[in-house]
């Protein structure tokens, strides 16, 4: 029995009533739970001998807005314009029937040498999650970062302030509906002799990635690419 198989067996035996989903893919074990079950699950994962997850190595927010939608919705590939890099795909957009936001935790057991991902989805209308700072001190800045970038509140955090943006920043820049160029920019005004906020003067534009073609313009007579 591998380490992951042992871990899955123990999770199913001990936490079946608290988790809503358990998956294993690419050598990673992931469990999902509801917000109200987060702390009981985390306490068990930290304190039970068979788990012994003594370290929280990462915590992040995720915004699933438009998850799985096509970036380029065009009917055909052309030699110019926005659709020139289109490749037809049989796969359709993913259907996600879960809340828009999620919080993801990565746990490590230095005793058992195994890892676990814990995920919980949070309703957009009530973006509040219990803090795990009292369980792992490393959660302090992780939770502040998730609050700053996504607007997720962590109930019980001792100092939930912005971490990466400045004090007067409005909004949460890692949300998918936040403008890429931002809302305002900060600059020094020589007349006022102070730093001010002003609307961004960046003109929105579409950036098309480099397209590598494999057609007759680049294929030699022998069927290989020309140097």
Curated annotation (Swiss-Prot):
Listed GO CC annotations: plasma membrane
Subunit structure: NDH-1 is composed of 14 different subunits. Subunits NuoB, C, D, E, F, and G constitute the peripheral sector of the complex.
Enzyme Commission identifier(s): 7.1.1.-
Biological role: NDH-1 shuttles electrons from NADH, via FMN and iron-sulfur (Fe-S) centers, to quinones in the respiratory chain. The immediate electron acceptor for the enzyme in this species is believed to be ubiquinone. Couples the redox reaction to proton translocation (for every two electrons transferred, four hydrogen ions are translocated across the cytoplasmic membrane), and thus conserves the redox energy in a proton gradient.
Any GO molecular function: quinone binding
Family: Belongs to the complex I 30 kDa subunit family.
Subcellular location: Cell inner membrane
Organism taxonomic ancestry: Bacteria, Pseudomonadati, Pseudomonadota, Gammaproteobacteria, Legionellales
HAMAP family, sorted: NDH1_NuoC
One Pfam family matching this protein: Complex1_30kDa
Protein name in the entry: NADH-quinone oxidoreductase subunit C
SUPFAM superfamilies per the UniProt record, alphabetical: Nqo5-like
Main location: membrane
Membrane topology: Peripheral membrane protein
Catalysed reactions, as listed in the record: a quinone + NADH + 5 H(+)(in) = a quinol + NAD(+) + 4 H(+)(out)
Keywords: Cell inner membrane, Cell membrane, Membrane, NAD, Quinone, Translocase, Transport, Ubiquinone
Top-rank taxon, per record: Bacteria
